[in-house]
Amino acid sequence: MKLYFKYLFVGLFSLSFYAVNAQNVVGYCGTQSSPISDAQLDANLAYLAIHKDELKVRDVRYVPVRFIIVQTSAGKGGINVKNAFRMLCKLNDEYANQNIQFYMKDDFKYLNNDLVNTDPQSQGAGNIMKNVKDKNALNFFFTAEIKSDNPGSILGFYSPEHDIMVIKNVEATYESQTAPHELGHFFSLRHTFYGWECQPWNVGDHGKVVTFTVAPCYGAQVELVNGSNCTTAADKVCDTPPDYNFGFGWPSDCRDYNVEVYDKNNELVRPSQNNYMSYFFGCSGYHFTQGQKDVIWADLNSAKRNYLKSTYTPPATTVSNDIEYQLPTDGQEVLKTAPILLQWAPVPNATFYIVEYSRKKGFDSNVTVTEVVKTNQYTIPASYFPSGLATGYWRVTAMNEYAICNVQTNPPMSFNLVNVVSNKVLTEVKSWQINPNVVASGHLYQLNIDMNKKSDMELNIINSAGLVSHHQKLNFTNGKHSVEIKSAKLVPGTYLVVLKNDSGMESRKLIIQ
């Protein structure tokens, strides 16, 4: 049983419409008409009629977003977290000209439930999501499917009753228009063709000249080209031209809509194909009109959206995507049967990192693990890589709650998987030692080294848990050198000082008291 009357596409179209257009039906919006959304739109329009001037000055509003990844009841599947970030990046780009920006509030939530994962519009699934959602954020649920009894595929929907967004996993991308469209519904916008959802225009049923005044659905008025009824018809926004759902079934390359359709005044109807609230696919320059933007801003500032008010400001609007990888170095040998420590230098203004490790250089999704971590280290579990594999790959992307648009374009790091790590000496080094090798915490100690050849080297101090406590890059010329190191960050314990370069690696013991 559905929560409200749903846009029904079965049996309401003429056979001629399906014969011509069925091959072009790739997906549609599942947002349902409801008294709740109707009342909210009317309240927003009433507010604008009186207070529109108050909304002219619009400082940037940061809106908290919570992501809920839905998996099977067995905990399988679920969207890749990178796709959620790409979708959020898209929303920020598309809503930037409205001074509305979204940021990730708290960590990802996970919900293991088959019903929600396949039929999120069912009453049972709706009640589950209502109980799971974050009451102080705009909630996005990502599901594998959105069950429909009608032709085509539901791509996403906003539930006014539960105040949640649901996006089909495959639609969580930067390229898809689904999330900006459904977010328009969240902010009380209707389709530009409101009233034609259940029966898009076709010449057999409606004629070349549409003479009737009431649209097929919801008792909505048929909007006229001259704008005389724009405040009461269709989407009730006057700077969006009439649209009788011409986009449903239209080829998804957004070719010009060249079908001649006239309203009752014999005026040619020309829809806005690249409006976010239309049904035309594959267009460029999707946009909201100023009238739609006003409704969105009024909705965001309404009492109903008080739960979205936040004092958050981003630590930085951008985060560098240059990662200084530390361990393992590119091509380093690691034991495939032991945990593999990954470490990189902290990135300024980053509050978390996406870590990916893979069995293939191309990071194919079926052989790649993606994790979100808040530190600059991650340990791959022992024996993750199969025994016959020779090379593993990894990469890191830095982000913060708002700066989520980074895409990793640098070549990945690799490590060689071995059963026994070879003990290669440093051929450029005559001798080296740590002096003293027993030192009180906070005191200085030295690396004394005698080189027989210049070399770039790395020094790592590793604690008893196998984590890197200190990392330093060094450059030596031929001869003797001393490098002072302070132990202020080292707690008492036993450490391994590892010196390495491309030719080999050697270690010495260090004790902090």
Question: Where do the language-model regions lie?
Answer:
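C-terminal tail/sorting-segment detector
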Residues: 22, 39-40, 404-420, 492-513
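Beta-strand-rich modules
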Residues: 384-403
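Conserved aromatic anchor
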Residues: 340-348
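Propeptide-to-catalytic entry region of secreted or membrane-anchored zinc metalloproteases
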Residues: 23-138, 142-147, 313-318
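The catalytic-center signature of Zn2+-dependent metalloproteases
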Residues: 172-286
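Residue-level detector of functionally pivotal "anchor" positions at catalytic/ligand-binding pockets or at interdomain
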Residues: 314-330, 413-441, 452
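C-terminal outer-membrane/trafficking sorting elements
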Residues: 425-435, 439-513
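Active-site-proximal segment of zinc-dependent metalloprotease catalytic domains
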Residues: 126-201, 210
